[in-house]
């Protein structure tokens, strides 16, 4: 499968999602043409290699391939190619401005991180097929902890 991917690569929320999704697609043999939003900021060689590979593939991108854009809901106008355009906004609010609705409505489909987010898209009346695609956890960075054997809940507040 071929895919055009637009996303930032940095240490902020969208950027962390962008690099992890890029690497996951590449590991699963998707031919990803990567079009960065902003200057990629990588922190290790593995990430640099993934970005380099995506940029090299983008030189001869398939204009008919689907395009996924991981970015803000008010900036969905720009896309790569003429294939299906799938917006992947990550948001926390329960309403959208008219500008945001207009940009989201311009997408062929949407991907959102939770059932809650899909409910918001449905509630505001957007006529766009919306798919729930939860983000994952990097088990190498955050290894699973053993489950507690008692019924206590511990909260830790730092800062």
Regions found by a protein language model. Name each.
Residues 1-66:
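N-terminal pre-catalytic "stem/leader" segment of glycosyltransferase-like enzymes
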Residues 3, 149-159:
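Conserved donor-binding/catalytic core segment of Leloir-type glycosyltransferases
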Residues 6, 88, 113, 133, ...:
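Short hydrophobic "strand-cap" motifs at the C-terminus of beta-strands
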Residues 25, 29, 125, 146:
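Active-site catalytic pocket residues across diverse enzymes, especially alpha/beta-hydrolases
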Residues 32, 85, 128-130:
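Hydrophobic anchor at the start of a short beta-strand
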Residues 41-122:
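Extended catalytic core of nucleotide-activated donor transferases of GT-like folds
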Residues 98-99, 136-152:
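Acidic anion/phosphate-binding donor-loop and adjacent secondary structure
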Residues 108-119, 127-144:
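Donor nucleotide-sugar binding/catalytic pocket of nucleotide-sugar-dependent glycosyltransferases
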